[in-house]
Regions:
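Terminal helix-turn-helix DNA-binding modules in bacterial transcription factors
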Residues: 227-235, 240, 244-245, 263-305
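Short hydrophobic/aromatic patch on the recognition helix
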Residues: 256-257, 261, 306-307, 311
């Protein structure tokens, strides 16, 4: 498990960069200046952060936690904080309330109230790339109003509180237009460009209807069932098992199981398992300890030719 202690007690721009004030399991280092800092987590990746306005910090996230199922965060907050998460690749989840977990994936945008989320985060695919914008609404509100007079961050914060503390916007062209360009910016104009795009995003929020959004949360029991199903599917890659059998084994309807699994992992059950098998086979091939015939059997293919065809279609080579 990967532990992070978050300490955001004083001024936003002074102390948000102490996000990793105490990190267990891995060493880390922080380098940079007043406007840009790199939080290097070694083998686990890095955060690249930019101080945009008073109370607003942008962070680009690139982490790899293949050997850690969960990230536990202990936070200390003295201000009203909004978090805006955009997923470029991978999947991310965190707890909301006592028995809800929300998941989002590639292209999705999630806005949440920080102190209404709990301490456990999950990265189902073992990696995550994206960006996160931290907004101290009390510190940033007057400044943002200079540029967007009709948009009030505090009112927006209170609106989210009435909507379970979060809202999720699935990937769409509008989000891609506003957010997508942030990942590819000439170094000479980065800071100015990030400021403009941040204001554009808030302007987009000012005309977006957040009153109705889909139910995207799962209960902790549903998440546990999905995790148990995943473990069963990968612990014996040679076995053949149907969705009906899985549903019966875990006391859940077939339809609910399929929906829950896709929410967590972003793909239908057996598409996910097929890709897992082929990724595992790729590692075995690279290891050089087994023949193709042996590997095909280890990942559940009845013949080397069927395995070779599937591998070629997925990986692009044999």
């Amino acid at each position: 498990m990967f532990y992070i202690r978050v300490d955001i007690i004083k001024g936003m721009n002074e102390n948000l960069f102490e996000l990793f004030g105490e990190v267990f399991v891995t060493d880390f280092s922080i380098t940079g200046d007043d406007y840009k800092k790199i939080i290097d987590l070694g083998e686990y990746g890095q955060f690249e952060t930019y101080s945009l306005f008073p109370g607003i910090v942008l962070a680009f996230i690139d982490i790899n936690l293949q050997n850690h199922e969960n990230v536990y965060v202990e936070e200390k907050l003295s201000s009203r904080l909004l978090m805006i998460n955009h997923c470029l690749d991978g999947r991310y989840a965190y707890s909301v309330g006592d028995d809800e977990i929300i998941y989002f994936g590639k292209g999705d945008l999630c806005i949440n109230i920080y102190d209404m989320t709990k301490t456990c985060s999950d990265f189902p695919l073992g990696f995550y790339n994206g960006l996160e914008i931290f907004i101290d609404v009390d510190m940033a509100n007057d400044y943002v109003k200079q540029y967007i007079p009709d948009f009030d961050l505090i009112e927006f914060y209170e609106l989210l509180k009435k909507s379970q503390g979060y809202v999720l916007l699935r990937s769409n062209n509008k989000i891609d237009h506003v957010i997508g360009e942030l990942y590819h910016v000439d170094n000479r104009i980065k800071l100015s460009y990030f400021k403009l795009k941040c204001l554009e995003l808030l302007l987009f929020f000012s005309i977006t209807n957040f009153d109705v959004h889909e139910n995207i949360s799962l209960t902790k029991q549903q998440v546990k069932i999905v995790d148990d199903v995943k473990n069963e599917l990968i612990n014996d890659l040679e076995s053949k098992i149907t969705i009906d059998e899985l549903a019966d084994n875990y006391g859940i309807s077939k339809t609910t199981l399929k929906k829950c699994f896709k929410k967590v992992h972003g793909k239908p059950i057996f598409k996910w398992r097929k890709e897992y098998k082929l990724e595992y086979a790729c590692k075995l091939i690279e290891g050089g300890s087994y023949t193709i015939s042996e590997i095909s059997k280890m990942v559940g293919y009845s013949s080397p030719s069927k395995f070779t065809q599937a591998f070629k279609e997925y990986i692009g080579c044999t």
